Regions:
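Short acidic (Asp/Glu) and glycine-rich catalytic loops that position anionic groups and cofactors
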Residues: 24-25, 40-47, 54-61, 98-104, ...
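Short amphipathic alpha-helices in soluble, non-transmembrane regions
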Residues: 1-3, 117-125
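Structured segments of extracytoplasmic/periplasmic soluble domains
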Residues: 70, 74, 83, 123-131, ...
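Long, C-terminal catalytic modules of enzymes
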Residues: 95-102, 114, 118, 129, ...
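Short, conserved charged micro-motifs
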Residues: 56-60, 112-119, 222-226
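C-terminal regions of mature proteins
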Residues: 1-40, 45-51, 139-277
Length: 277
């Protein structure tokens, strides 16, 4: 007979420090150049993350970010991959890290510089505003319903459901019905709401515009590519130069910036009581 003894000791809250996320200053584009670890890698890559500040109701904010990621995904891919053929990887979507949300755009290219890739993302985001505002009601509702159906889709594997619950546990939020809460907010969102959200967080003129651009340069030769128009290219570069802050020491940068509060854990204590497994 085999017996196993487990010795338990008391753990203090200080043993589990809450992760804190750097809050970017509004109105700035931060760029960070990551070193290329593979000397034979010809591709350059960039990730631009539009940080979404925590000022809306938690679930409404999540719903707006998810819906924007849904509607922008196909036009972004069509423009930069299909039409401009910028590279192997063209992706956009939402992100969430310890309660702080974002909208991300990722490009990987073996023929364009990271500066050019950054300019194309900024230009796309600016030009997409008019496309979003002119979207007809039927197309908007189709995108919204597709997102709702995806959110409410039952897990195909036990591991999917397990991972979803463990994600809430490891973050210490314990809101196991978060999908239903987000869907309830999605049903309320109108196109006008989404455009207002876009103006505030995605446009350079928005009051809550803040972006982090992480870049790495490949070792392959890059050709000089031309933008859609010289006028648009010049406008983008002018706005970039006046708002861009280069991060040279990432650790020093993190220690010099304000942090978001431990919002997700604090707000979810009251919700945890009503959450159902």
């Amino acid at each position: 007979m085999i017996s196993i003894q487990i010795h338990l000791s008391h753990r203090y809250a200080s043993d589990y420090p809450d992760p804190r996320i750097v809050r970017l200053d509004r109105g700035h584009l931060y760029t960070f150049e990551r070193p290329q670890v593979n000397k034979d890698q010809p591709c350059s890559a960039i990730q631009m993350m539009y940080q979404i500040d925590l000022e809306y109701d938690e679930w409404r904010l999540q719903a707006l970010v998810s819906l924007l990621a849904q509607v922008v995904q196909e036009p972004f891919y069509d423009k930069l991959r299909t039409k401009e053929q910028l590279g192997y990887l063209v992706w956009s979507g939402s992100s969430e890290m310890w309660g702080v949300l974002g909208v991300r755009f990722i490009l990987q290219s073996d023929k364009a510089t990271v500066e050019y890739l950054q300019q194309r993302i900024l230009t796309f985001v600016r030009n997409y505003r008019s496309i979003l505002a002119s979207m007809d009601k039927e197309k908007f509702e189709k995108n919204r319903e597709a997102l709702i159906a995806n959110k409410l889709q039952k897990p195909k594997k036990l591991s999917e459901e397990t991972n979803r619950y463990w994600n809430q546990i490891t973050k210490r939020t314990y809101v196991f019905d978060h999908r239903e809460l987000e869907v309830a907010e999605l049903r309320k969102i109108t196109l006008k709401d989404l455009v207002a959200f876009y103006d505030k967080f995605m446009m350079e003129s928005g009051s809550e515009w803040r972006v982090l651009s992480s870049r790495t340069t490949g070792n392959g030769s890059k050709v000089t590519l031309k933008a859609d128009s010289e006028k648009d290219d010049g406008e983008t570069k002018k706005q970039e130069s006046s708002r861009t802050i280069e991060i040279k020491d990432f650790e020093a940068f993190k220690h010099s910036m304000p942090l978001y509060p431990v919002r997700a854990y604090l707000k979810s204590k009251s919700a945890a009581a009503s959450a159902k497994l």
